[in-house]
Structure formats: structure tokens, C-alpha cells
């Protein structure tokens, strides 16, 4: 952590704890005490006593703030945007990692000592130990030997024992006789000429700045160029899968920066040495510079500030970058080439991205949910899953800020102890008397959020918080033709092809064209026969992840049948969620419901169309006949067939006529099953 040297504070000489000399003390001790008092109360004490003053720096963009409230308010904008992008990335990926035991490797790593921790609670406790060690960073430095002391008492004792020994070793002399009043003091010497100092150094290009305002303005040029490079990278991607790959690459950006910087400093490889040599030469004129900071100053002074923004050019693809580290990281893509997945033939730019992608095929679960025990392959999918358990964010700081990402939460906690990556001081500041601090202002009125415990100082911040955290995802990008909203700009570009009819992606096997690269890749699996997605329960393979997820619903159901039987609607209500509103049938999948609805659509179209040719009139169905059986004592004595249904009285009369004996009418039995 860069140390900020501030103005030295003067120690008052006439304090309550000043050294009191008794009148009974001998002359030798009085002379030594007077020498020590004069030394510690003069300019020597003020010029040798230093303490550190910490400023708060944003971990995302490097902006400096004097108070904690200002940097927290500023970081809120970065964190809300990045959490929304992570959620959208997880939803766009469309992949669900398998439920398998973890590999045993610790999912969390301490950023201070690189120790692997198994659970988030242990990681937070481990981080607290580091924070307590570095909680007190104020030290006092001796101006003669540059030794540091944790308290002013130790500093004064060191000055008395080490640097005032010459005055103590002098032979004692008797007290001087009383002298007349001293003459008036000479006029003070003129102040020394003011020296221009540039205490702020840029970590990207080593440029020195005199004030924090100039430092922030200079840092903005690097961040603008970085945003432009990321925007150009997104423009080159064609589909959501490639966008997910870019986001995986962004997760390893810090590792790539460290590897690139180590490659620049290494001398054992000729290509790295040539790249470092080319980084110190100006691309517009033959002048060579000794350092990257001198080169940046030369380009800004001679060729304008615009030329210093993207000063590093790739010799193979003519792309420009703002720093030599990014140029070296980009050059590895030309040297090492791309990396292809052997399972699904997906191509990645980095080996780390390929390894992370292959974990999905192997079913590794490195991140476990502490609530339900489910395993996930990436931290993004784990964070998205944890939001299903609770609506509030996962990590809460003592200052009131909440985070859904543990890494951002740990970086934020370091700002409370001053370890936020402040710029390095390269020159000291002349001492000046400390100014009295103004009384603290009363806190502004806080507006609480009705959905979470957070509160805000203004209504605009409260509305922005509710819209970004608790509201639905915004669709800021609109289609100029139909006005449909999208979350990302690349989705608008893909949607415009539906209006123009453009199909730029063609299959080399059958010549069929598609509007997106993802649809072409999905279609090519039908030619190659590759089924990259396999069910771990039954071993069945699928060409698309959506088909695998639909298939897994059969295994997750409480009852599984070898053959789907015909069950009543009440039995299928909780197992088949797709319902036909025409005939009332239930289906397990939407595809089955759509195929079934085509039958009703075809039937309706046939009823609406006129007959093409007169069809032969079918013969009338035979009229139903009614059979009446008359029995007597269990024996059938008459069978009567009628074409029209008869009443019960008429049937009894027919039976009596058939028997021919009126006295036997009481013994007649009518078989009502045939009436």
C-alpha cells in the first residue's frame, strides 16, 4: 500500500507534561535539560516528525476521496452496474451445472496470503485477522536515521538518546553570571524558494502529477481507452455464447495484467525483450525514451494528448492499446493461437477460459451453496442461485453497504483500513502548522428503502436504488423499427436481422443460411452427429442444453414411469404443466402441446374450407330397435322387437296379449335392462 506523507504536526512546548526543572537541581542537570527542551521545541522536531494520512480510493476506477462517505457513494454506481451484468450473463449462458461432489479444492482464496479457505465464514474470519494487523498504520520517522516509531513518546526518547548525545557529552560548565537583557533578535531569513513537486505517480504510465485533480484527470484517459477497447471487443462478438466467453476473459483480466507485466520485466525470452524495447520507442518519430513515463510525456508534448491514449500498436492486426501490458497480453493470442473444446468444438482465446468451460462437461462443482448444498462450476452461477434463497444481498459491511459478490465485499472492507491502493508519494511536503478541524456537520435526513434496510440521503438516490436493485431489469436499448427493448446492444443488432431478412451465416455442408452464429453452430451438430450434453442419470445425450434440461425434469419428478400411461387430469395436474384449452389434455413438454394443437388447427381449417368435389352421401344409419323380453317364473316366454321406444304400460299390454291369459298378468316380470 502506497504511503501518503502529510504535513507534520507541531508539538506544543508549554504543555502540561513539559519537563519541570526543580530549583534544587544542580547546574549540570539544568543545562542538559535546557538543551533537550530547546531541541525538541524548535524546527528540528517539526521537520523530523511525520505521520501518514490516508485517502480513500475507488477500487474500480481509482478516484480519490477525502472522506469515507464520498467514496462509498461513488462506488455504489460501479457495483450496481456490475451486479446487473453478472446476473444477465448467468441468465444468457443457459447452462445448469450437474450435481456432483466437489473436487476437494478450496473454493475461496485469501488475497493477502493466498491461503485456501473452504467456507465464506472462515474466509471472513481470516480476513479480519489481516485487517486487525494493519488497523493502525500511523508511524513517526526520525529525520536523521529514517527509523520509524509507533508513538511520539518513543520518537522523543530516541531523539534524546541517539541524536542529542553530543550535547550531553560536553563538559559541564558553571552557571553563567546574570547578564543584561539580550539585544533584539535579527530579522527572520527570507523563505526558501518554492519547489514544484509532483507527488502523485500514475501506475499505468509512471506519469507524475502535482495535485489530486490532475492525477484523476490523467487516470480518466486510461479508463476511457479501456472502455473503448471493451466496446470494440463486444462489437466483434456475434452471439451470446461468445459474449459469455468475453466475460470469462474479463474475470481473468487482473491475472493477465500480472503475467504481462512479468513478461515485460523478464529478460530470458527474446520476444519479450523486443516488445519492451518497442514500448520505449515513439511510434511517430525516431526518438527513444528511457522509461514508459518519459515516453508518455514525450508523445503528449510533441504529438498531442490524443496520440498518448492508444500509443501501443500491434504489428500483426494494427490494433492499438493504452499500455504495454495490454499489448503483450494481446500478442499472446497471435503466438499461442486459440483453444478448441474437444467435446463441443467451441473455441476460446485463453486456456483458462477453456478449462473453465470444460468443467461444465466434467460436471465439477467447485462452489457450494451453504443453504441447500448444491454445487456450481462458477461463482457467477452460485451468486445467481443464492438470490433464490433470500431477496437481500449476501454480504453486508459495517458501514451499511451490501454486496452480492464476495470479492467486491472484501475489496470494499479494505477501504476502511486505508489499504485501498492509493497512489505513491515520491516527494515530501514541507511542514506546516496544523489547522483546527471544523465541527462535524449534522447528518442529512435519511430516506429508508421500504424493501431493504438501506437508507439514502436524497430521493433521487432512493429511486435509482429501487429501480436497479428491486425493480425489473431495464431494457435500455430499443429497436428503431418496432420499438422492442433489449438489455444489450448486441441483441438489438441480432434482432434487426429479422426486419432486414439478412442471413449472413451459411452452412458449408447443406448451404442453409442462418441469422445468427449460435443457430448455425446448433445446426451443424446435425451434420456431425455430436451430442455434447449428456444426462448423468441415464446416459442419454443431447445436442442442446435446453433439451437436456427438459429431459432432466423426468428424473426430478417424484414418480417415474417406464411408459407414460393415460392418467386422468387430476393425476397429471402436478406433473404435466402444459394444458390444451381445446380438449383439456395435459402434456409434459411445450413441444408436445404445440404438436397436439396442430391437430385442432388442421380440423378447424377443414371445417372452414368448402368441399372440392361432391362426396357421396353416406347411407342413413339403421334405426335403433328396442327388444322386450317377457319372462314367467324365470323362463322367457316372449320376445318383442319395436322400432320406437314404448312406455311401460304399453309394454305390459303387449306381454299380456302374447301370453293370452289375463290371469297370468300378475306373474309377468319385465326385464327392465332392455327397456
UniProtKB/Swiss-Prot annotation:
Keywords: DNA-binding, Metal-binding, Nucleus, Repeat, Transcription, Transcription regulation, Zinc, Zinc-finger. It is found in: Nucleus. A zinc finger (C2H2-type) spans 56-78, 108-130, 140-163, 200-222, 312-334, 339-361, 367-389, 395-416, 447-470, 477-499, 505-527, 533-555, 578-600. SMART domains: ZnF_C2H2. Residues 225-234 have a biased composition (Basic and acidic residues). Residues 269-281, 418-427 have a biased composition (Polar residues). Residues 235-261 have a biased composition (Acidic residues). Residues 171-194, 611-624 have a biased composition (Pro residues). Belongs to the krueppel C2H2-type zinc-finger protein family. May be involved in transcriptional regulation. PANTHER family: C2H2-TYPE DOMAIN-CONTAINING PROTEIN (PTHR24376:SF243), ZINC FINGER PROTEIN (PTHR24376). This is Zinc finger protein 526. It comes from Mus musculus. The gene is Znf526.
